[in-house]
Amino acid sequence: MQIVVASYGARIRAKKGLLIVEGREGRREYPLHQVDEVLLLTGGISISTRALRALLRAGAVVAVFDQRGEPLGIFMKPVGDATGAKRLCQYAAATDGRGLQLAKKWVWLKIRGQLENLKRWRRRLGKYGTYAESISKAINALASAATPREVMEAEAAAAEAYWAAYREITGFPGRDQEGRDPVNAGLNYGYGILKALCFKSILLAGLDPYVGFLHADKSGRPSLVLDFMEQWRPRVDAVVAQLAEELEAENGLLTHKSRLRLAAAVLEEFNATGRPLSAEIHREARSIAKALCTS
């Protein structure tokens, strides 16, 4: 179970096996053993140390976000599946080509997801055929890519067509991580939630989040998390496109109402199939860790 807390002044405490959240929306109670993640999306939230301890004992994760949706920190148990051997396998894969093959797979899944989004929007796209053809060509180019640069070139070619289509659907000015319009702010916010889920699973799988296979390593940049999350970005894109006309921004940031609405919609999408995405992410991370040490 994922719990979103986005009300300024909300209080979180634990009592008799329950997590209690009190705020503007009233009082909510959740069995602690059913809680997987608690997402704190705004400032002014207080959580007791008793609640924090109870959540950690239950194996839950508490993630704190800034106003842009960027995860600022994650409270979780010391990693139980971390071994030096797994990280050594990961470091070897980063240089012997196996890591690049994983990165290609994740980029392929992202581009395929982008193409699926276009198919859903085809009746609203005047240039659907042109966009779809460009993305299909990028998929073919990716299949023969042998270097990180070639992978990124294929990814960029698909992105050019995809975001042009997205502009036609949403009316936003174009994809810009620093964009101050509601759609770009919404994409950043949704990706932040996805990033937190991926970061948690990478750590629990015993891998190093800061050593990736495609994104360049840089101090403080969780390169593996950024590589790993690529495959699920289109699901966030679809939610933001659906809410594009509802989202509002002030000074380049989503309003409180929009943050709450988007977070609820993103988590609803992540749990819509009956197989929660957080569980899928966790399984995939463990599968990768196992494969790196057996291949």
From Swiss-Prot:
Keywords: Antiviral defense, DNA-binding, Endonuclease, Hydrolase, Magnesium, Manganese, Metal-binding, Nuclease. Signal peptide: none annotated. Its cofactor is Mg(2+); Mn(2+). InterPro entries: Cas1, CRISPR-assoc_Cas1, CRISPR-assoc_Cas1_C, CRISPR-assoc_Cas1_N. Its EC number is 3.1.-.-. One of its GO terms (biological process) is maintenance of CRISPR repeat elements. It holds the Pfam family Cas_Cas1. Gene3D superfamilies: CRISPR-associated endonuclease Cas1, C-terminal domain, CRISPR-associated endonuclease Cas1, N-terminal domain. It is an enzyme of class 3 (hydrolase). CRISPR (clustered regularly interspaced short palindromic repeat), is an adaptive immune system that provides protection against mobile genetic elements (viruses, transposable elements and conjugative plasmids). CRISPR clusters contain spacers, sequences complementary to antecedent mobile elements, and target invading nucleic acids. CRISPR clusters are transcribed and processed into CRISPR RNA (crRNA). Acts as a dsDNA endonuclease. Involved in the integration of spacer DNA into the CRISPR cassette. Belongs to the CRISPR-associated endonuclease Cas1 family. Homodimer, forms a heterotetramer with a Cas2 homodimer. This is CRISPR-associated endonuclease Cas1 2. The lineage of its organism: Archaea, Thermoproteota, Thermoprotei, Thermoproteales, Thermoproteaceae. The gene is cas1-2.
